[in-house]
Amino acid sequence: MARLKELYHKEIVEQLTKDFGYSNVMQVPKIEKIVVNMGLGEAIQNVKILDSAVEELAAIAGQKAVITKAKKSIAGFKLRQGMPIGCMVTLRREKMYEFLDRLINVALPRVRDFKGVSAKGFDGRGNYSLGVKEQLIFPEINYDKIDKIKGLNITIVTSAKTDEESRALLKHLGMPFRH
């Protein structure tokens, strides 16, 4: 079992139940999924850039990435509906906990001048999103094979009803929030 999952079941559930006064174990918020998304606007001119992005995202997440396509045509961006413009991975269960562990303990500390993640990334429904400016912070990425620095968005979807509950859950899991 993943280290964070074990920590969640053994300690965090008990701690959150005490903090928020839940009457039932099923009320305790848990992480449902993590979505890692890489939006590549430059894929409009150069579709080849998507191949390397899919490969990198698969290496980071440990799971095959799907190519996302444009929902609408936007003339200003020379974009047609259905054109490939990015890639994403949805992680659940064991892989989700392993990815979160790597993100918190390995990748985020490698960010230059890292002071913690912003506490403003909550959406009001108990989900948290953060942006990563470069994919090089992940140890799975080979520095020599990088043709272009690409950023990515990471969304952590929780079953929490409020941002306060979600923040407490992530803090117990070790997410380094700025003060």
Curated annotation (Swiss-Prot):
Q: Name one Pfam family in it.
A: Ribosomal_L5
Give any GO molecular function from the UniProt entry. Answer: rRNA binding
Q: What Gene3D superfamilies does this protein's entry cite?
A: 3.30.1440.10
GO cellular component, as recorded: cytosolic large ribosomal subunit
Record has Hydrolase as a keyword:
no
Q: Which InterPro entries match?
A: Ribosomal_uL5, Ribosomal_uL5_bac-type, Ribosomal_uL5_C, Ribosomal_uL5_CS, Ribosomal_uL5_dom_sf, Ribosomal_uL5_N
Q: Which SUPFAM superfamilies match?
A: RL5-like (SSF55282)
Top-level taxon of the source organism: Bacteria
The regions listed as transmembrane in this protein's record are none
Q: Tell me the GO BP annotations in alphabetical order.
A: translation
Q: Which UniProt keywords apply?
A: Ribonucleoprotein, Ribosomal protein, RNA-binding, rRNA-binding, tRNA-binding
Query: Does this entry carry the keyword tRNA-binding?
Result: yes
Family in the record: Belongs to the universal ribosomal protein uL5 family.
NCBIfam families of this UniProt entry?
PRK00010.1
**What function does the entry list?**
This is one of the proteins that bind and probably mediate the attachment of the 5S RNA into the large ribosomal subunit, where it forms part of the central protuberance. In the 70S ribosome it contacts protein S13 of the 30S subunit (bridge B1b), connecting the 2 subunits; this bridge is implicated in subunit movement. Contacts the P site tRNA; the 5S rRNA and some of its associated proteins might help stabilize positioning of ribosome-bound tRNAs.
Assembly mode: Part of the 50S ribosomal subunit; part of the 5S rRNA/L5/L18/L25 subcomplex. Contacts the 5S rRNA and the P site tRNA. Forms a bridge to the 30S subunit in the 70S ribosome.
User: Mind telling me what this protein is named?
Assistant: Large ribosomal subunit protein uL5
Gene designation per UniProt: rplE
